[in-house]
Amino acid sequence: VKQVDPNAAVVATSVGTRLGAKNNKFYKWYGPFLDSLANYGWPIDAYAVHTYPHSLGTPVDRGILGEKFNRLLKQKGAPIKPVWDTENNFGLKGPGPQNPDVDIEGAKAANWTAIAYLDALRLGISRVYMYTWEPPNDLWGIQYYDGSPGATAMQTMQEWIVGTRYRKCTNNKKGTKVRCNFTGSEGLFQIVYPTKGRKTFKTSKRYSQACDLFGTCSPIKNRKVRVAGPVLLKR
């Protein structure tokens, strides 16, 4: 490929991680592939992974799979290169009959879409391709087309973070509350979200407004916000 087009980006073969939730089963296939890449001097520009969790899985499960993929790269001595999540969604049927198709709609679809991108920052995943943009298709748990909650979340995330500097995401000790810090044209801002359910976050006095994924901003009262999904805290 490079001989024909030296500027082409060569992306490694992707691996689906959903069978590795409990036993790292995907290591069995992808480990030897990484060994082969090493033998050829790592002739790629990026790694690829599909971090679909099982159909009943959540963004937390997806994050665990991403961590397992990163761990395998480290075990194999893989050089640092971009990691692309070239297919992602939630609720996709399988593996096995115990994991039926799940429809994820409304605010949950928006929240999980946004979390997929925010967790990617924490995991060092530089690209995420949510599958797939098309008319409604029952194969996918979250639907992506103009005006759908998932698509709205994509647009909002672009407005919030594109062109800003990502600083760091931190968890509380229980791993139930995430704060992601950015620097934009107006200075520091945060995006906060729970890993499960609804949680209350204490806020810095520098922030006066909390904005949700659907574009509604409200004044912050008593320096606290209670949220079920990603919320932007700003001046």
Specify the residue positions occupied by each region the protein language model found:
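Extended non-globular C-terminal regions
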Residues: 51, 209-211
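Active-site proximal loops enriched in glycine and acidic residues that flank catalytic Cys/His/Asp
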Residues: 87, 132, 192-194
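Noncatalytic carbohydrate-binding groove/subsite architecture in carbohydrate-active enzymes
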Residues: 1-113, 123
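Detector for glycine-centered tight turns/loop "hinges" at secondary-structure junctions
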Residues: 146, 212-218, 223
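Aromatic/acidic polysaccharide-binding cleft in carbohydrate-active enzymes
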Residues: 89-161, 165-176
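Carbohydrate-binding surface patches
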Residues: 171-206, 213-215, 235
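C-terminal beta-strand-rich structural cap/linker in extracellular carbohydrate-active enzymes
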Residues: 218-235
